[in-house]
Regions:
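Active-site beta-strand/loop signature of hydrolases that rely on acidic residues for catalysis
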Residues: 23-28, 47-72, 110, 136, ...
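Beta-strand-turn-beta hairpins that frame and shape the catalytic cleft
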Residues: 16-23, 105-107, 111-116, 129-151, ...
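Active-site environment of divalent metal-dependent phosphoester hydrolases
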Residues: 30-33, 63-66, 100-103, 157-160, ...
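Solvent-exposed loop/turn segments connecting transmembrane beta-strands
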Residues: 101-102, 126-130, 158-160, 250-253
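Metal-dependent phosphoester-hydrolase catalytic domains
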Residues: 3, 8, 13, 137, ...
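N-terminal, active-site-proximal structural segment of metallo-dependent hydrolase catalytic domains
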Residues: 2-87, 94, 99-104, 166-167, ...
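Short, solvent-exposed loop/turn elements at beta->coil junctions and helix N-caps
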Residues: 95-100, 124-125, 245-249
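Conserved beta strand-loop-helix elements of the APE1-like EEP
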Residues: 86-88, 102-117, 224-240, 264
Length: 266
């Protein structure tokens, strides 16, 4: 009887643990510190593992880089998103948006849940400033629920961002059912806070930190965050918790600090 009770306790505990969906978004600066001198991808790997997120949204991640293979002894033998995913996140998608002679970088999503489908959407306005949206749908294994996830890295220039935001809003409107759970996360470069006009009123998509704290989280630069560059938006999910991961080790890794949010999925 004690054995059965312990089994039941374990099952209940497992169900309770699966009742939330934890996500983080992180611009990893191609695996280098803010000075571009130290290769810190191994530190990033160890740190994001400690968060134990179900889904990881990554920006500025190398899909291929040939020159660096010869410069750093600890450069991974596989690509960066596979190196970070390792044995924790068995499902991943990568969309390249900046291509050069020595390789390419872009956005990636690491997930503990399988992808139903994913697509990389080019939103570049100029060849020299390539940008894309990585849109995937994952299935929560225990409930068969589908969740749309979009990883974003928008441009540095105001007019460029406005057009990209319009394309993102159009993508949500045309490809995400209104009753489907949705998470949009990434580096919006939106320090002026103009993304809201594209999401809140017409799409009912809200930024979790502004919703819970009254303002966007400050994520850049990592050593003294002043600008609100990174965001997590959601629709159709109940927010349980959200945190801006200040302090060590994050301030010594990338030039951005990550954001974490947890949602109820029941």
């Amino acid at each position: 009887l004690c054995f059965i009770n312990n089994q039941l306790k374990q099952q209940i505990s497992a169900v309770m643990q699966r009742s939330t969906l934890k996500v983080i978004t992180y611009n990893i600066h191609k695996g280098f510190d803010s000075s571009n001198r130290q290769f810190i991808l191994h530190g990033i790997k160890d740190s994001i593992r400690q968060i134990d997120a179900d889904v990881v949204f990554l920006q500025e991640i190398h899909g291929e880089r040939n020159i660096s293979n010869n410069r750093f002894d600890d450069w991974p033998s596989n690509n960066q998103f596979e190196f970070l995913a390792d044995e924790v996140w068995h499902h991943h998608a990568y969309g390249k948006n900046a291509i050069y002679k020595s390789g390419h970088h872009g956005n990636a999503i690491l997930s503990k849940y399988p992808f139903v489908e994913w697509e990389n959407i080019d939103v570049s306005l100029m060849q020299s400033h390539s940008r894309s949206l990585l849109h995937g749908t994952i299935e929560i294994t225990e409930t068969r629920q589908h969740v749309h996830i979009i990883c974003v890295h928008l441009g540095l220039f105001g007019m460029e961002r406005q057009r990209q935001l319009a394309k993102l809003a159009s993508r949500i409107d045309s490809h995400v059912p209104h009753d489907a759970p949705l998470i949009v996360a990434g580096d919006f470069n939106d320090w002026l806070g103009r993304a809201e006009r594209y999401f809140a009123k017409d799409l009912n998509v809200h930024e979790v930190f502004k919703l819970s704290h009254g303002r966007h989280a400050r994520t850049f630069p990592a050593w003294r965050p002043l600008l609100s560059m990174d965001r997590i938006y959601s629709r159709g999910l109940e927010l349980v918790d959200c945190q801006c991961l200040h302090g060590n080790p994050w301030r010594k890794l990338s030039d951005h600090i990550p954001l974490m949010a947890e949602f109820a999925i029941k």
